A protein has these predicted regions:
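N-terminal maturation segment of proteins
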Residues: 1-511
Length: 511
């Protein structure tokens, strides 16, 4: 950690040496993005013991499967490096397990409920040791490679199996052993704010994952106001078109039934054709939409789909994976991951030839905010069975989905910033007319991964706020395609910087 901090400080010093006034406009944008990025990122060092490398949703053990099963093999060297990386996992995990032991000694180890989630994840991962998915998926990948001889494929399959059996699985068994020993040493069963410095650390997480410059209190006010607006909008839709409302309520599970007969590519291609009027023309986006390997469907049961961006030097290799166990009503999922969501955003931004350093930063608030915004737009291009109710169905589906993510974001703030107990969380769900039976699972999910949903909830509402701002500013002159183009051209960044770009490009009239 000390080495990381020294490296971090070095890069901050390098940036401060640059005279911003001497830069081009694009370089100034990159400078501003980096400057704010470093300012926020410094928060991780305020209390390093609040960092959690094994959290159930974002942790090392939770993401190994997709990291390795989607590993790109472009040449023989890639295969060799893959197997080498597998062999390094025990040592890599051990460094963080030593950190967990130190966290425990300092009183910062996770709660028993979260600890058990991690143990259960690892136990699931090592099931079927003799026929492990990391062996079967790798073997299938090898069979598809045309640059290897049959002898090389056989040799690599043996090397991989040995690495899985002797390195990867023992590394996960080691997590189970260490976490079983440490279980019970946690001092806090509630949100991160109950640790010393926890509220400040949550502010860092919020800014990191949502891309917001707002304080946690300001985000609470924003989400509370948006919830009131959602309730008002739902009532208005009900009173303006009761028949459509009742149709939606009665047919909710079958709204997208027609997509069950369509392939993933069929749906994405249709959205590319029908929704393109609202987005800048980028030409043909080459992609593949493929199901998860059967062996991964259960292990990644909570994953509907995900987008894998291509390498910088191979822009046509966009990949969307979807879970074959959850193919019902995939329209919005594929809009989120594909077009006009993540895939369009990444493809368009990379087509602008951005500064390389900007491609290294994630900005999940921007990316997930855009994907949410884009998938809601796709609702208005779907051909519903009851065509006369189309716009109302789209409105209601959007409002219903918005409310789910908003409530999760608000509860996260309640637990991890305001210190809500489990009972207070149940009370909040009940007050919103939602099932409090899911409160236990939701509570410990958010305790285990503070701010994990903020890139979706706060990230989306930050983008919505910018859209409302631009519409108010331009009135009848507002053009949705122009607005979307500015968002995509600017690329992943913090929302306050994105607003400055909107002001600059929409005739410079700052409100």
């Amino acid at each position: 950690i000390k080495e990381d901090k020294a490296e971090f400080d070095k890069w901050v010093d390098e940036l401060e040496k640059i005279d911003r006034a001497c830069l081009t406009e694009d370089q100034k944008l990159t400078y501003d993005v980096l400057d704010e990025y470093f300012d926020v990122a410094a928060g991780v060092y305020d209390n390093v013991y609040l960092y959690e490398p094994f959290s159930p949703m974002r942790g090392l053990q939770a993401n190994i499967a997709s990291m390795f099963t989607d590993y790109r093999f472009d040449d023989k060297g890639d295969v060799e490096r893959y197997i080498e990386l597998l062999g390094q996992i025990p040592e890599y995990f051990q460094e963080y397990l030593d950190f967990e032991k130190e966290k425990s000694e300092k009183g910062y180890f996770m709660s028993d409920e979260v600890c058990q989630k991690v143990i259960d994840q690892c136990q699931t991962f090592i099931e079927n040791k003799d026929d492990h998915f990391m062996v079967t998926v790798f073997n299938d990948n090898m069979d598809r490679l045309d640059f290897l001889t049959d002898e090389e494929k056989t040799e690599f399959k043996e090397q991989n199996k040995e690495a899985v059996q002797n390195s990867l699985i023992p590394a996960f068994e080691n997590i189970i052993t260490v976490f079983t020993d440490l279980k019970g040493t946690g001092k806090n069963r509630m949100g991160i704010c109950n640790y010393e410095g926890g509220k400040e650390y949550y502010e860092y997480l919020l800014k990191t994952y949502a891309g917001t410059s707002k304080s946690a209190d300001e985000v609470i006010d924003m989400l509370d106001n948006e919830l009131k607006n959602l309730m008002t909008d739902i009532y208005q839709v009900y009173f303006m078109n009761k028949d459509a409302y009742e149709y939606f309520a009665s047919n909710y599970d079958d709204i997208f039934a027609a997509t069950n007969e369509m392939s993933a590519s069929d749906m994405i291609d249709r959205m590319m054709e029908d929704a393109s009027e609202n987005y800048p023309d980028i030409g043909t986006i080459h992609y593949q939409a493929e199901p998860l390997d059967k062996s991964l469907e259960t292990i990644m049961d909570d994953v509907l789909a995900y987008y894998m961006a291509p390498a910088i030097d191979d822009p046509d290799n966009n990949l969307i994976r979807y879970n074959g166990m959850h193919t019902d009503g995939m329209w919005t999922t594929l809009a989120h991951e594909g077009y006009p969501g993540h895939m369009l955003q990444n493809a368009y931004y990379m087509s602008t030839d951005p500064e390389p350093v900007r491609t290294l930063m994630s900005f999940l608030g921007y990316k997930e905010g855009w994907a949410m915004y884009a998938c809601y737009d796709s609702l208005y291009y779907y051909q519903y069975e009851e065509e006369s109710y189309g716009d109302t169905i789209a409105d209601l589906y959007k409002l219903n989905d918005e409310m789910s993510y908003l409530v999760m974001g608000r509860i996260d703030l309640g637990i991890n910033y305001e210190g809500w107990s489990l009972d207070e969380t149940k009370q909040y769900l009940t007050e919103q007319g939602m099932d409090a039976g899911s409160a236990d699972e939701l509570y410990y999910t958010l305790v285990g991964d503070p701010a994990v949903y903020q890139s979706y909830s706060t990230g989306y509402y930050e983008l919505k706020e910018l859209r409302d701002y631009a519409e108010e500013k331009l009135g009848d002159a507002f053009d949705v395609k122009e607005f979307n183009t500015i968002i995509l051209e600017t690329g992943p960044c913090q929302y306050d910087i994105l607003k400055k770009q909107i002001d600059k490009k929409l005739q410079g009239n700052v409100i």
